[in-house]
A protein has these predicted regions:
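Divalent metal-binding acidic/histidine catalytic loops
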Residues: 1-162
Length: 162
């Protein structure tokens, strides 16, 4: 049962790397039980495989259109930062080609692991409308507040973007 569980997790990790973003968090959580899986963990994996079988037409679509910021909660932050200006050098050349926009979504759940009280970070980075980076990972530190766990997730996302 031990090696069977490891094989199933390996296949699911491969599927996540190929673009099945919708199962990234579940696979990450179940990966923490590789050393000593129980029957409930095998059943959870089989549920994921059933989900993949039912939704076998799901795929990542790479779209070159730019993001419409009207879809988000606040596209304009001038209420909070009225004097903020983007510093563009005066001798900068005119942009060529289509516009490229990167958008990053970050989230963390505070102390979601009931045993170790560690939080889990999730990052999804888009280039225009195409996801290019995604992951779900348990944080290395134990944070005492939601703000702390969100900040750790934001730091990890910033390192990926920069």
């Amino acid at each position: 049962m031990h090696t069977f569980f490891q094989q199933l997790i390996g296949i699911l990790r491969w599927a996540v790397e190929l673009g099945r973003i919708n199962i990234a968090c579940e696979v990450s959580i179940l990966s923490s039980f590789l050393a000593a899986p129980r029957m409930g963990h095998i059943e959870a994996i089989l549920h994921i495989y059933a989900h993949l079988r039912q939704h076998n037409r799901s795929r990542v679509v790479f779209d070159s259109d730019t993001v419409d910021h009207g879809e988000y909660i606040r596209p304009d932050w001038t209420d909070f930062y009225p004097d903020a200006r983007e510093a563009v050098p005066t001798d900068a050349p005119e942009p060529r080609g289509k516009a490229v926009q990167s958008t990053c979504f970050v989230d963390a759940d505070h102390a979601s692991d009931r045993v170790s009280r560690r939080s889990r970070s999730g990052v999804l980075i888009y280039l225009n409308r195409s996801p290019i980076v995604w992951y779900s990972k348990r944080q290395n530190s134990v944070e005492t507040s939601t703000f702390g766990s969100e900040f750790v997730a934001l730091k990890a996302a910033t390192e990926l973007v920069v």
